[in-house]
């Protein structure tokens, strides 16, 4: 059995209030010592106002909050900044960056030759957002004419700084990938399905979404009632215009996928059900008013049909049509203990998870478990329902790969996200002692003993 650990980079220990790249190499060393083969992270694109990486203002950019400030200081890219709280980090980076020094580097020039169009667009969106606020408040002429705004402001100092910081982000991330390879750890990335309601994608390519004449959504995203919410969930992102996306052979989406495959060793496709059909909710209505629309997912993924680097999130409202679509690909699906309980799912997943970012880690799962679920677990395990026995169950399912949440191994873990809520999510962090040598030995021994 190969073991993987699920932990967002923002959950790494940090004194700034939010994890970043500064502890990534330490964590990779910890994972190797603990016997893990995979590190699954959440998206590393910019986050929304609620810190969610799944409602990003730019699905292709990097989250500048993740930059390792101390490393930038050591390499002379920043004037001395010192400790800074994450809430002030972006402003501090903009004011302390040695812009001309970074721009003079051959690496930066090569980066801009390869990715300049995308990165400049991201910088322009940052500039316009700081000037006008939420997209709905932008002047209509700015909303509807990205290219005129670009021509007028592409050389603005703030846009140039954004491009330079984006280069430094990719440089730091490349170093982390190389470190992971050196430790024999594969990093599993995550491809969100939708951008957020305010996004550079909506501004730069409005034809890719179902929008009205003022570029406001006619439909928004969400899901009907499911195991997370009886009334359904309203995600509120503008929905894709799949006819328009298909008309140019999915160039936008395929470029996103190619970029993600270059950024990670393996790639999880979030909300894979959305590539077979997707739920449309009329703007201003509740999820109950929504309906399903077909999506040409088989054509979209044709170039990667046999590519082994993908895994898919096949959770939520699933039907026979979805399973027929899913089974046209060779990619493993997911089974999640905290969602399925002791009964296996209707198909055998190739990757098993104790939980994901939307569920409690095992100690909290046990603590909150209702009596009926506890009774079913006792029948299956023939003993007490506790974290240790659930770890036994996960290890002995005979799956090729099992993923754990780091919180499964902690006395007082926290939860990453509660679906259907906005506040208090995407903030949980590991205590520093959770990734020391003793912790690695304990986890390695724990899994080794259970694998016997």
Would you name each region that the model predicts?
Residues 423, 440-452:
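C-terminal accessory segments of extracellular proteins
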